[in-house]
């Protein structure tokens, strides 16, 4: 028998822990599925928890939060089960593969009916196109000049429910997209990467092995020169016995070491910021991938909200955004942004690179942004294009 298969070996204990985690995740997912099934049998006659059931919308709204919470638990626990099962190459499962399949089938039987409707009640493509093409001025129901049949009224009410549901989902998802990556960035920066990089601090390295670019320590040279001049002025104006050259040399050496250590610390802090930003970006991408349905709904809602604006407002937003890239006021703004970025990542400030960036990149972004917006306006709002052309003339 191989050594890593011995009972009590670290590898065996690790695989045993993975097995227990996988079984626990699968059991938790099954418990959540059974909770949904219990609500279905008790209050919805064994059918789907939906607003169009015999119980009505009020009962559905009461159990909606419970349904969403249990579905989220199932998704999370199944992801845990798949991840631990992927990492575990051991066959030391406490339950057989047949029992796992039975549990997965039982869970799938319950959640399958909510797979495509948990985020949004689907509307047929024809009715969605009709909603998108309705002008905001004509979307007021008090201005409809025709008689509505019962079927038309039900369709309109269903569309309104879908819009309210879209707004709720989009608002929550946008809040999650903002706060979760920020939280991950802050926590990883202070709890993970900062202590890790601290092991490579500069005070354990010989000074002779430290090399910096001239741009990096130019600021510290200026600060050292000011400190030296201040020390000389204090010595000249002091009524006490002036410091000897050896004492002055010690003070200057102490200040130089402090500034070099500060420069190295700032450089290390840039590495910490870079790693933390990458962690926040990874969290953002994971949220987009895991909640792909919600991201699509949010995109559709934002697009519909923008199209619902009047043409003058659309053109104003377009001009405002394009002027942010190129304009008499934007050059200094780009300088401030680039200086903050270089300081954030601990990079040396290069004025020539900043000027080249300002002379090329904003112009390219402005042209690309105008092309995309014109293409979008031409397809979705031709009137806005006409208004914009008149304003430019």
From Swiss-Prot:
Keywords: Cell inner membrane, Cell membrane, Hydrogen ion transport, Ion transport, Membrane, Transmembrane, Transmembrane helix, Transport. It comes from Synechocystis sp. (strain ATCC 27184 / PCC 6803 / Kazusa). PANTHER family: CHLOROPLAST ENVELOPE MEMBRANE PROTEIN, CHLOROPLAST ENVELOPE MEMBRANE PROTEIN-RELATED. Disruption phenotype: Reduced H(+) influx activity following dark to light transition leading to a delayed transition from H(+) extrusion to H(+) uptake. The double mutant missing both PxcA and PxcL is impaired for light-induced H(+) extrusion and later exhibits lower H(+) uptake activity. The double mutant missing both PxcL and FlpA has both reduced light-induced H(+) extrusion and later lower H(+) uptake activity. This is PxcA-like protein. GO terms for molecular function: proton transmembrane transporter activity. The lineage of its organism: Bacteria, Bacillati, Cyanobacteriota, Cyanophyceae, Synechococcales. Pfam families: CemA (PF03040). It is a multi-pass membrane protein. Belongs to the CemA family. PxcL subfamily. It is found in: Cell inner membrane. Signal peptide: none annotated. The chain crosses the membrane at residues 173-193, 271-291, 306-326, 354-374. It comes from the Bacteria. Together with PxcA, contributes to transient H(+) uptake following dark to light transition. Required for H(+) influx to activate the Calvin-Benson-Bassham cycle. May also be involved in CO(2) transport. One of its GO terms (cellular component) is plasma membrane. Disulfide bonds: none annotated.
């Amino acid at each position: 028998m191989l050594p890593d298969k011995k009972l009590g070996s670290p590898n065996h204990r690790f695989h045993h822990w993975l097995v227990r985690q996988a079984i626990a995740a699968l059991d938790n997912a099954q418990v959540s599925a059974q909770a949904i099934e219990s609500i279905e049998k008790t209050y919805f006659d064994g059918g789907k928890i939906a607003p169009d059931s015999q119980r009505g919308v009020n009962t559905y709204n009461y159990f909606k939060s419970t349904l969403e919470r249990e579905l989220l638990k199932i998704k999370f626990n199944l992801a845990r089960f798949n991840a631990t099962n992927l990492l575990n190459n051991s066959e030391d499962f406490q339950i057989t593969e047949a029992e796992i399949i039975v549990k997965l089938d039982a869970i799938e039987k319950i959640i399958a009916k909510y797979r495509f409707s948990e985020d949004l009640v689907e509307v047929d493509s024809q009715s969605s196109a009709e909603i998108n093409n309705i002008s905001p001025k004509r979307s007021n129901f008090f201005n409809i000049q025709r008689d509505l049949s019962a079927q038309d009224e039900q369709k309109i009410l269903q569309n309104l429910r879908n819009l309210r549901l879209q707004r709720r989902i989009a608002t929550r998802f946008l809040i999650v997209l903002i706060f979760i990556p920020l939280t991950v960035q802050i926590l990883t920066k202070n709890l993970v990467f900062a202590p890790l990089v601290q092991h490579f601090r500069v005070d354990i390295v010989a000074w002779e092995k430290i090399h910096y670019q001239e741009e990096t320590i130019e600021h510290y040279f200026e600060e050292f020169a000011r400190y030296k001049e201040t020390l000389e002025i204090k010595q000249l104006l002091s009524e006490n016995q002036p410091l000897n050259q050896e004492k002055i040399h010690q003070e200057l050496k102490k200040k130089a070491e402090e500034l070099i250590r500060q420069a190295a610390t700032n450089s290390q802090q840039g590495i910490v910021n870079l790693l933390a930003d990458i962690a926040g970006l990874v969290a953002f991408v994971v949220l987009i991938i895991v909640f792909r349905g919600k991201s699509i709904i949010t995109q559709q809602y934002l697009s519909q909200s923008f199209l619902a604006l009047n043409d003058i407002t659309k053109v104003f937003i377009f001009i405002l955004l394009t002027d942010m890239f190129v304009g008499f006021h934007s050059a200094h703004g780009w300088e401030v942004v680039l200086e903050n970025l270089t300081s954030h990542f601990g990079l040396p400030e290069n004025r020539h690179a900043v000027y080249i960036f300002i002379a090329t990149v904003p112009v390219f972004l402005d042209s690309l942004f105008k092309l995309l917006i014109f293409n979008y306006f031409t397809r979705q709002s031709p009137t806005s294009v006409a208004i914009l052309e008149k304003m430019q003339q």
